[in-house]
Amino acid sequence: VTAAFEKHRMETEVHVDRLEEVFEKFGKSARGKTCPAIDGIIEEGSEILEDYDGAPALDAGLVAAAQAVEHYEIARYGTLVAWAEQMGKADVAALLKATLKEEVATDEALTGLGEGGVNQRALQAAA
């Protein structure tokens, strides 16, 4: 689970670079902005860390929280791709599609972790 999170953290740096490029194509400067939805998901993840620290359910809970973030990002990038295409901005759409593809791949990898044993270990420990 830790390796998957680290891999995605590094991918996120590339995603930020792409977003900065998208903003440049519109003649704008990118800026960080707080997202209450993501903040809520992160808060849930923090609660999972507190409640299940050291327990087998911890990894399952963290995978679930990470997938919630991925699903939010997939929804947002999907919308941005559609808007870019409708605006005739194929170059922007291509940048956003690259990130969308990586977000979907991360979600699939997280599903693989869950189905590959993380969820089962949590269930066995709870029984």
Task: Tell where the protein language model's regions lie, with residue ranges.
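Amphipathic alpha-helical hairpins
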Residues: 1-127
